Every structure is written in structure tokens, then in C-alpha cells.
């Protein structure tokens, strides 16, 4: 089977949520022609969909070595790094995606992700700046409003996370919040969700 047919099969399996099949076919495509980035990108997407961010990170990293000027691949690498909890690597990859002229549709997501990292690190000013840039590309959405409200609230209340272990992303609304508890419960006082 030729490379193009394998990639077509990968995309078909991926579209049908058959991620194991998609990954297997992507690996076959890589074995057929390891000089092309597309096989690695497909394998990375399948691995990410299977919940293996570390494996996805490996595939996307290799894809960036094959196609050094494709900003969209750097975005995918940054996304996998974010899922693996590598904040500093994430920012580097996302910045590289912007420098490499990634698609306009991706730029808003990049600024939104960087703002979340800024918020996790207690850098609310830069988080707000990045949220404004995200809004320029994707318009106003619910997540941007939530994140902006949290940043403004934390800035005005003087709540800065000095201990990163007490700062986490809320499991329900996906906004980064300091872990503030009431009377021993795990309910977050800022968003009202039980995290």
C-alpha cells in the first residue's frame, strides 16, 4: 500500500473515532516514508485522542523536525505539552507556532492557552493581555469571559498563588482557580463548582 493511501486510511479511521486503527495506520505510513511530517502528525493526533499526551508529544516533536516552518505542527506540539503538564515547553512551542505563521484560526487558541498558563503562574496582567489577543482572533466566547473574570477578581482581591500546589484548573468549568475551600469541603468559592 502506498503512502498516500495509508494517510487516507488514517484520516478515515480518525474521522470514525477509531483511534487505535488510525495510530496503527499512521505508524505504517511512517515506516513507508519517514521523511514526511504528515505521518507523524497523524500519529500524534491519534495518540492524543487515545489519551497518550507523552506519545503525541514525541510524534509532534519529530514532525517539527521534518517540517521546521509549519506553525500548525508547533501548535499541536504545544497542545500535547500542555496536556503533559510542561508549561514552559508549551509556551515555547506556541510562540514558535505564532512565529511560523500558523493558521489564523489557531492563533486565538494559542493566546487562550498561553493566558491559562499565565493564570496558573499568577501572572494575571499577561493573562489578560493574552485573552484580549485571543478575542481579536476568535471573538468573545464563554471561556474567555470566565478566564477574564477570574483574572480580574484575583487581581482586585490580591489573591496570588504563592504555592503552585494549591492552584489547579477547575474540573467543571476548566478555568484556572486557586484552590480555596470552605469548611473542609472541596467546593471552590470563586466558581461554586466542586473540583
Predicted regions and their residues:
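Register position in tetratricopeptide repeats
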Residues: 15-16, 49-52, 83-84, 116-120, ...
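Single-residue signature of alpha-solenoid repeat helices
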Residues: 22, 56, 90, 127, ...
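Structural marker of alpha-solenoid helical repeat scaffolds
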Residues: 32, 66, 100-103, 137, ...
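Canonical tetratricopeptide repeat
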Residues: 42, 76, 110-113, 147, ...
Amino acid at each position: 500500500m502506498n503512502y498516500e493511501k495509508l494517510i487516507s486510511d488514517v484520516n478515515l479511521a480518525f474521522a470514525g473515532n477509531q483511534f487505535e486503527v488510525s495510530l496503527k495506520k499512521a505508524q505504517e505510513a511512517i515506516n513507508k516514508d519517514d521523511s514526511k511530517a504528515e505521518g507523524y502528525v497523524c500519529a500524534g493526533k491519534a495518540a492524543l485522542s487515545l489519551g497518550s499526551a507523552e506519545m503525541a508529544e514525541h510524534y509532534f516533536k519529530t514532525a517539527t523536525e521534518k517540517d521546521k516552518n509549519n506553525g500548525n505542527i508547533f501548535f499541536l506540539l504545544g497542545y500535547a505539552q500542555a496536556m503533559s503538564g510542561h508549561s514552559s515547553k508549551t509556551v515555547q512551542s506556541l510562540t514558535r507556532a505564532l512565529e511560523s505563521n500558523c493558521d489564523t484560526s489557531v492563533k486565538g487558541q494559542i493566546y487562550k492557552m498561553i493566558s491559562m498558563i499565565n493564570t496558573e503562574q499568577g501572572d494575571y496582567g499577561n493573562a489578560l493581555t493574552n485573552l484580549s489577543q485571543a478575542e481579536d482572533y476568535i471573538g468573545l466566547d464563554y471561556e474567555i469571559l470566565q478566564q477574564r473574570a477570574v483574572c480580574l477578581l484575583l487581581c482586585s482581591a490580591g489573591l496570588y498563588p504563592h504555592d503552585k500546589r494549591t492552584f489547579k484548573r477547575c474540573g467543571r468549568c476548566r478555568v484556572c482557580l486557586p484552590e480555596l475551600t470552605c469548611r473542609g469541603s472541596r467546593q471552590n468559592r470563586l466558581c461554586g463548582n466542586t473540583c
